[in-house]
Amino acid sequence: RQRQMCIRDSLLGKNKFNHWASLAQVGLANAGTATEQICGIGIPALSVPGKGPQFTKSFAKRQQRLLGGSVSLCESKDIFHEKLLYLLKNKKFRVRQGQIGKERMGDPGASKIIADFITSKLK
């Protein structure tokens, strides 16, 4: 029981995304910002667009171009299965795809730098 609580406390809660996401080999993505976050920490993602108004096939295609090879659009279960197996079996390829995401998203902290810059211009 105590071990379960320790695991729970280390994975759940505010500011835990990087901790648990970094444990993954591949991310399954169906949301815009989460996809960019997981690719940004070097985890390649498989993108599965839904029927909702925001994460559509066209959005997923644009995001795939933005993030390069770090995210791969899967338009069917078969494609998803094929790409997932390939990523899991090919560590060198998986690591390279993850590196592309890190390069495309850049270092952490850009939002604060942008906000500080804007604030300085408004003074």
Region annotations inferred by a language model:
Residues 1-4, 8-123:
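Nucleotide-activated sugar donor-binding and catalytic core shared by glycosyltransferases
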